[in-house]
């Protein structure tokens, strides 16, 4: 992160922004939680850390004393904190488990809607989140509906397969069933700054995927075999949980579908809107007037079923995304539909 911030400052300076003043008063008012500032490891760039407040059940649709919990899952699914200015700094995997645990403790909650808007994420993070939802259903017997928003691809869709029912919006992008590992060769870029790497290693393949050189044939074969195994696991999970899906290679080649196409192929059970998911959950609970609540932090208010938590640092949004620069901060193999090589949805 420090390298990216420094790069951003240099980029801004060389672009002639020295005469422009950046006002921060509005940014401070947007910070979603109480924060304090510390120095980063090199003692130069500040980091903003938020104080974790307990999750609260915030009503987004009024009703009876019986509740339906709407759990929001947005953005890149990785097992790490997305900390920085303007971000709640949540770990998506940790937060998802925390919300499921709170739902399980609340005896007034009778059903769960998982609202997913995600390109996907790390192979392991996505798999863990799905397993957590499967375990939750096994322990509680509670009905679960997944509603896909703008994007329900890769690991985001993998998570949805753990639900009793999947609903997609008419314009949802569904699919991206595949595995990707992004590697970049920065040898020429480093040479422009007179930087050269010198690696001392014990083990022929221990530096496989290094940005300092291209892969050889053996290395490419090793990584491809791993990707294919992860992809086969993804396919097996879909086929086991979606009985109407046919084992057709054409639909498992990473392509994407509209909500209607996904329904025709059996990847989703219906096409509708979030109100339709709520109505279905109410039917499952036997209470057509059940209250709908979202679990958010005290400083992160939810007033409608569309409420989202800011979980991407403002500084990252202000900087150019350079392929390869984020590689060390992300998982390796990913269940993700990736239209952008920077992997920052």
Model-derived features with residue positions:
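N-terminal organellar transit peptides
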Residues: 2-4, 9-146, 151-152, 158, ...
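Active-site loop architecture of trypsin-fold serine endopeptidases
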Residues: 171-179
């Amino acid at each position: 992160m420090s390298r990216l911030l420094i790069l951003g400052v240099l980029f801004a300076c060389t672009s002639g922004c020295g005469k422009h003043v950046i006002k921060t008063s509005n940014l401070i008012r947007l910070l979603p939680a109480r924060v304090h500032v510390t120095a980063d490891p090199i003692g130069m760039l500040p980091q903003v850390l938020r104080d974790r407040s307990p999750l609260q059940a915030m009503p987004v649709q009024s009703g009876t004393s019986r509740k339906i919990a709407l759990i929001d899952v947005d953005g890149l699914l990785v097992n790490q904190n997305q900390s920085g200015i303007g971000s709640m700094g949540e770990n998506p995997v940790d937060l998802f488990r925390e919300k499921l645990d709170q739902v399980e403790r609340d005896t007034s909650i009778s059903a769960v809607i998982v609202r997913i808007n995600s390109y996907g994420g790390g192979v392991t993070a996505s798999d863990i989140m799905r397993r957590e939802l499967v375990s939750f259903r096994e322990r509680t017997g509670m009905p679960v509906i997944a509603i896909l928003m703008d994007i329900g691809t890769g690991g985001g869709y993998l998570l949805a397969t753990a639900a009793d029912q999947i609903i997609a919006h008419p314009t949802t992008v569904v699919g991206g069933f595949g595995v990707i590992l992004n590697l970049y060769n920065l040898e020429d870029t480093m040479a422009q700054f007179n930087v050269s790497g010198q690696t001392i290693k014990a083990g022929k393949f221990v530096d496989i995927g290094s940005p300092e050189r291209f892969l050889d044939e053996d290395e490419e074969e090793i990584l491809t075999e791993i990707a294919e195994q992860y992809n086969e696991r993804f396919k097996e999970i879909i086929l086991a949980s979606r009985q109407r899906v046919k084992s057709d290679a054409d639909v498992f080649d990473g392509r994407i579908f509209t909500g209607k196409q996904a329904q025709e192929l059996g990847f989703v059970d219906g096409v509708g809107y979030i109100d339709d998911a709520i109505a279905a959950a109410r039917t499952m609970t036997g209470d057509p007037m059940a209250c709908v609540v979202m679990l958010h932090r005290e400083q992160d208010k939810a007033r409608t079923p569309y409420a989202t938590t800011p979980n991407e640092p403002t500084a990252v949004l202000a900087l150019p995304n350079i392929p390869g620069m984020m590689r060390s901060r992300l998982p390796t193999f990913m269940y993700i539909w990736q239209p952008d090589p920077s992997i920052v949805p």
